[in-house]
Amino acid sequence: MTSPTSVAGPLRVANAPCSWGALEFDLEGEPIGFAQVLDEIRDTGYSGTELGDWGFMPTAPAALRFELQSRDLQLLGAFVPVAFAEEGNHAEGEARALKTARLMRDATGTAPLIILADDNGKLPERTRNAGRIRPEHGLSESQWTVYGAGVNRIADAVRRETGLRTVFHHHCAGFVETPDEIAKFLESTDPAKVGLCFDTGHY
C-alpha cells in the first residue's frame, strides 16, 4: 500500500492570521501586528501561513519575502471574499484577486493559492440562519449561473496572468454553506479552473 508521504512528501501544517483575530470581520479589541503573528506561527512549529487581509502584511514583494524567509515560513495562499451572487461585484473582485496574486507570485518561489470565498456574514438572513440553512434561503438557478460564472472568471484571470491556482472556501453565513450548496457550487464551476478548499468546520 502506498503511504500518503510517499506521494506528496511529509505532511506539514500551517496557520493563518485569522487565528489571531486578523480577518475581514469586525472584532472588538486592539489588533496585533503581523510581526507578532508571524513570530508566534514560527515559534509554535507551523511551517507556513496565509497572507491575511490585504495590508496586514507588507504589500511590497521584497519586504514580504524578507519577513517570511527570515522565519523560514512558506506563504500558502490568500483569502479573497467576493459577493458572487451579484454580477456587478465580479470586476472589482477580479481586480482584488489579481492584485493579491501578483504580490504572492512576486514574493515567493512557490505556488500559493488564491482562496476565493463568498462575502460571508454580510447578508442578515444567511447570518441569522447560519448552521440551519433551508433551501428557501439559497440562490435561484439564475443566481447560481451568475455565481459560477464569476468564480470561473476570476480563477481564469488569476491563472492566465500569474499562473496561480484558485480554490474556493465554503463557509457559514455565505451562499455556499450546506452540503447541497457545495455540490451545486461544484456543478456550477469549472474544475479545471477552480478547486475546493474543503473546510470540515463548516460542512
Language-model regions: role of each:
Residues 1-110, 145-146, 152-153, 191-195:
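N-terminal pre-domain/capping segments
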Residues 3, 74, 86-196:
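Active-site acidic/histidine proton-transfer and metal-coordination neighborhood
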Residues 19-21, 53-55, 81-84, 118-122, ...:
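Active-site-proximal loop/turn and secondary-structure-junction residues that shape catalytic pockets
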